[in-house]
A protein has these predicted regions:
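Juxtamembrane helix-loop junctions of ABC transporter transmembrane domains
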Residues: 29-45, 53, 62-109, 113, ...
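Membrane-integrated ABC transporters
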Residues: 1-30, 38-39, 43-59, 73-77, ...
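Helix-loop junctions and hydrophobic alpha-helical segments within the transmembrane domains
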Residues: 92, 96, 206, 312, ...
Length: 586
């Protein structure tokens, strides 16, 4: 929780000071009401009707002032807590947005969602309650104790202490039972989100294998654990409310019994003053107990908020793998990419996933990567836009080491189409114009035509205003890929990266789209990862990868004769005649 306090703004502290000031006003008028009750009680014994009316009118004024102070406290408490939660959520979102791929691997998507929503909401609610009571409880308690000292009665004081000790003992037991379980509830909440998200995103596979019962059983195991834990915590906290009422009523009855015991046998004229003063004592004792209850409630809520704050702190204090340089340099070239003996190892791995990768691409050229699954193709291209940093060697874009350029500047010159096409909820126009919302409809249509997407978009009733579901689930795989390609093309970058982005297209459309890109963006450098040899045959350079090593570099015509790995891949897809090879693969 210390992290949250460190991030308070001066406005937050000013509001907290205002809460403190109005709390003093509230407690003052609360004590005045108790004093007035005593004065009215005395007036009924020895005063006049005028005195009673006068004190009654003063009590009404005190009650109104106390209510106004409480309303103002609620206003500042709610506003300050909301401000703290808003700042936390904004900072959390910014931090996660800066994460590299390796950073995201350390936190599951479900956990990050839970932390940014449920955890921050728990902190928000804890602060609302804390701001309402953190000053009221101790100030009321101290003020009441001071007044009790003035009207001290040893038996009544001891009675009050006994009930307070009982209350504290029960609370200590309650906290010992409940506190350790708060951390478990948050972890189980993460697990519930994982199970729910997995079932929803994989719904087609689940139904195809008739695995609904299996998925339900998996969910039920986690749900049962979470339910059992929450029932225990809920029961423990639920028992606290009636116990408070028991303490309050028990204290009042005990004090009245002590009073009756003390005045028993005394003369009425002698007993009456003590009985009347005991009324104020009972009210003050009740205020002390209520103050304890408020503090205890905070103590119950606070541990859960602390667990949530610790989870937020884990993310906020996480050291990001990819950072901007202190001083950025300008590009010296345009549309060039160069790898110099580049190697990359994933965090926690001693062995490099790729090593000794060297090549150079000039502006307007096409370089392609091919290799078996897990050979390191995506790992290599992830280092171009700095989704990950090389652990050895240098990656240069436009003549400059990518580590010496701000990530924003670097990515401004790169258009990236991922392996799995992803579209954002909204409409087609917004998705294609994702890099620049100010693109005209004509520019959007041109990009769609290059990606061969204009035909199916124009066939829709709303055309480019047609709705897009989250993730683009209302489009086929091929349509989704073409829209993603159009999004990259619309950016008109210096470098275009296609991470197996033609895999869902038929051979004819694949060839047309690549030709459109080459003709429509002649000065753009193209980086292509593909599994199909037909997609990369016309590339200026082809990098052949095998188990993280570069085993071939050149044109298709050269590699098909002198690179066994490339030849093996090619022959698995096309015949020797189609590849222009003689019988025997020569």
């Amino acid at each position: 929780m210390r992290y949250v306090f460190k991030n308070f703004t001066w406005k937050n502290w000013l509001c907290i000071f205002a809460i403190f000031c109005f709390t003093l006003i509230q407690v003052y008028f609360t004590m005045e009401i108790i004093n007035t009750v005593g004065e009215i009680t005395n007036a009924t014994n020895s005063g006049t009707t005028t005195d009673i009316w006068r004190w009654g009118f003063w009590m009404i004024i005190c009650a109104i002032c106390m209510a106004i102070a409480q309303i103002i406290i609620q206003f500042f408490a709610s506003g300050t807590a909301a401000s703290i939660a808003t700042n936390l959520r904004r900072d959390f979102y910014k931090k996660v947005n800066d994460f590299a791929l390796s950073d995201l691997a350390g936190f599951s998507t479900e956990s990050l969602i839970t932390r940014s929503t449920n955890d921050i909401q728990n902190i928000h609610m804890a602060f609302i309650y804390a701001f309402r009571t953190i000053f009221v409880a101790p100030i009321t308690m101290v003020w009441s104790i001071i007044k009790l000292v003035k009207t001290a009665s040893t038996p009544m004081t001891l009675t009050t202490i006994i009930w307070l000790v009982l209350l504290i003992a029960v609370v200590v037991v309650l906290m010992i039972l409940v506190m350790p379980r708060f951390n478990k509830t948050q972890k189980l909440m993460d697990a519930l989100n994982v199970s729910s998200r997995e079932n929803l995103t994989g719904v087609r596979v689940v139904r195809a294998f008739n695995a609904e019962s299996y998925q339900e059983d998996k969910f039920e195991v986690v749900n049962a654990k979470y339910t059992k834990l929450m029932i225990f915590v809920g029961k423990a906290i639920a028992l606290f409310t009636p116990f408070i009422m028991f303490v309050m009523m028990g204290l009042t009855l005990s004090l009245l019994w002590v009073v009756s015991f003390i005045i028993n046998g005394q003369d009425i004229s002698a007993a009456r003053p003590f009985f009347l003063s005991s009324t104020s004592f009972v009210m003050l004792a009740t205020q002390i107990v209520m103050s304890f209850v408020l503090l205890i409630t905070i103590m119950i809520l606070w541990p859960r908020a602390c667990v949530c704050a610790r989870r937020i702190k884990e993310v906020m204090n996480h050291s990001i793998a990819v950072n901007d340089p202190k001083e950025s340099v300008d590009f010296t070239e345009k549309g060039t990419i160069e790898f110099k003996n580049v190697g990359f190892a994933y965090p926690g791995s001693e062995k490099e996933a790729v090593s000794n990768i060297s090549f150079k691409v000039n502006q307007g050229e096409t370089i392609a990567f091919i290799g078996a699954t897990g050979s390191g193709k995506t790992t290599i291209i992830n280092m171009i836009p700095r989704f990950a940093d090389a652990t050895s060697g240098e990656v240069l874009v436009n003549g400059v080491n990518v580590k010496n350029v701000k990530q924003e500047t670097l990515r401004n010159v790169i258009g990236y189409t991922p392996q799995r096409g992803f579209l954002f909820k909204g409409n087609i126009r917004e998705n294609i114009a994702f890099s620049n919302p100010n693109l005209t409809l004509k520019e959007i249509q041109e990009a769609a035509k290059i990606a061969e997407a204009d035909s199916f978009v124009s066939a829709k009733s709303e055309q480019y205003e047609s709705a897009v579901a989250q993730g683009g689930t209302n489009f086929s795989g091929g349509q989704k890929q073409r829209l993603c390609i159009a999004r990259s093309v619309a950016k008109k970058p210096e470098i275009l990266i296609f991470d197996d982005s033609f895999s869902a297209l038929d051979y004819k459309t694949d060839k047309i789209v690549r030709a459109n890109i080459k003709n429509g963006l002649p000065g753009t450098t193209r980086v292509i990862i593909a599994q199909r040899v037909g997609t990369i045959m016309d590339a200026d350079q082809i990098v052949v990868l095998d188990k993280g090593q570069m085993v071939g570099l050149g044109k298709h015509e050269d590699l098909i004769h002198n690179c066994p790995v490339y030849q093996e891949i090619a022959l698995s897809q096309l015949t020797a005649e189609e590849l222009g090879l003689k019988k025997g693969g020569k």
